Regions:
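Non-heme Fe(II)/2-oxoglutarate
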Residues: 1-64, 85
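Catalytic core of non-heme Fe(II) oxygenases with the double-stranded beta-helix
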Residues: 69-139, 143-145, 152-155, 161-165
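Intrinsically disordered, low-complexity sequence elements enriched in Ser/Thr/Gly/Pro
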Residues: 20, 151-152
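Flexible domain-boundary/linker segments
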Residues: 60, 148-151
Length: 166
């Protein structure tokens, strides 16, 4: 049932996107699913710390709605296998993020630094560790280089909206 609702390979939801025309499986999440697993509370705390570092004290944070269905929020799982990659892109919303869910055991330094950001002509390739969450400005150009490993690399990506309370 969840597979038929949420997976780009199996969904019966009309207009289910193939993000950036990558052609690999994407699993979209509903707000209720994120609430049920505790991710909404976790990311609200992280986003508050992120905003505090910019001097933003009074804000309400919520999920950006998906553009293709009212069922989903703008939060999805990417399932990368050998030769999968994500081209340079940016995001919608006010805060974007990536959580590393799974890394292949056979990952080498190339695969462990496959997530790349560019800022002021400087490239940043942070080391990926399972469980690590990266929050960033959605306009920050980033991409994932082609994976060399056969085993799965799984990430959770999301976009948040921030409403400043005055």
């Amino acid at each position: 049932e969840t597979k038929e609702l949420c997976s780009s390979k199996h969904s019966k939801v009309e207009g289910f996107p193939d993000l950036l025309s990558r052609g690999f499986e994407i699993v979209y999440m509903t707000g209720q699913q994120l609430e049920d697993i505790g991710f909404t509370q976790f990311i609200a705390h992280m986003a508050k710390e992120y905003l505090d570092s910019y001097g933003v004290q009074n804000a309400q944070i919520h999920w950006n709605q998906s553009h293709f269905s009212e069922l989903f929020v703008d939060a999805w799982v990417n399932r990368y296998f050998e030769d999968n990659y994500t081209p340079p892109h940016n995001h919608a919303g006010n805060i974007s993020g990536i959580t590393i869910l799974e890394l292949p055991e056979e990952s080498d330094l190339y695969d462990l630094r496959s997530l790349e950001f560019i800022w002021n002509n400087e490239h940043h390739r942070p080391e990926q560790v399972v469980g690590k969450t990266f929050l960033f400005d959605p306009q920050l150009m980033h991409w994932v280089t082609k994976q060399k490993c056969v085993s799965e690399r799984r990430t959770f990506s999301f976009n948040l909206v921030v409403d400043i309370v005055r």
